[in-house]
Amino acid sequence: MSDPESLRCSSVRNRGGVQRVEGKLRASVERGDYYEAHQMYRTLFFRYMSQAKHAEARELMYRGALLFFSHNQQNSAADLSMLVLEVLEKSDAKVEDEILEHLAKLFSLMDQNSPERAAFVSRALKWSTGGSSKLGHPKLHQLLALTLWKEQNYSESRYHFLHSSDGEGCAQMLVEYWASRGYRNEVDLFVAQAVLQFLCLKNKSSASVVFSTYTEKHPSIQKGPPFVQPLLNFIWFLLLAVDGGKLTVFTVLCEQYQPSLKRDPMYNEYLDRIGQLFFGVPPKQSPSYGGLLGNLLNSLMGSGEDDDGVEEAQEDSSPIELD
């Protein structure tokens, strides 16, 4: 038998062996022998890892986790989900949409209040950017945001949308967020904060999309521009000014709309940062912002983010930290 034929036969035998083992594991789970099946999955995981069969280990743990989730065995399922991450961390697996979708699927099935879920998402985001201090791949953030939106966890969904490139999805979530939790006089506040924070994250494209989509879809906003709400007019002018990059326009705009900007003490802090990023305004002389506002702004900016270049999220796929 030639070498290629021998390799093909070996591969077929291996697949057949894996399928038989998985069949036994599934039967154990369906009989209710959860502990036995869980331990067997772990044994196979370490066996595959010792043989550097990373893809096989990852797929087996993923399918096993789904099986345990389908039988409401949260602890076993969460453990196998963590092993999926362990494979990714220890192998040279590239970040691909299919893997990100698998991670998001596991996240969606975990108990919403479990500590394992928080640990899982933290490790998954860290892996998705190569283990650096950056806060995760935009695609993974988008998938997490969509799951949290379905769970009506709007604040967490908003956080992940801000680190994605999905301005349209973010806007639609914000409309629902306002309808569920907001007051009528806050219709403009929901989108203004999102636009300003997207701009602070150097994501001009998503800032524009979230504004246009929100103002088009929101049932309480009359068609514009111009808008009835002064703050919405300010945001519209600001996005135009960012495209133009003229400091005088930005300065006059901020002065003219001060009454609207005083509605939230963070707005001027965000605008200081936007002035630096898009209009060449030098940073303040003080080494850092102080007090509560400083803590909030620093959490938005990240502690050591490089300011060089004004890039959109599609070009800069490592958004800065936002707590």
From Swiss-Prot:
The keyword Cell membrane does not apply. It holds the Pfam family GET4. Its main location: cytoplasm. GO terms for cellular component: BAT3 complex; cytosol. Residues 304-315 have a biased composition (Acidic residues). Component of the bag6/bat3 complex. Belongs to the GET4 family. This is Golgi to ER traffic protein 4 homolog. The gene is get4.
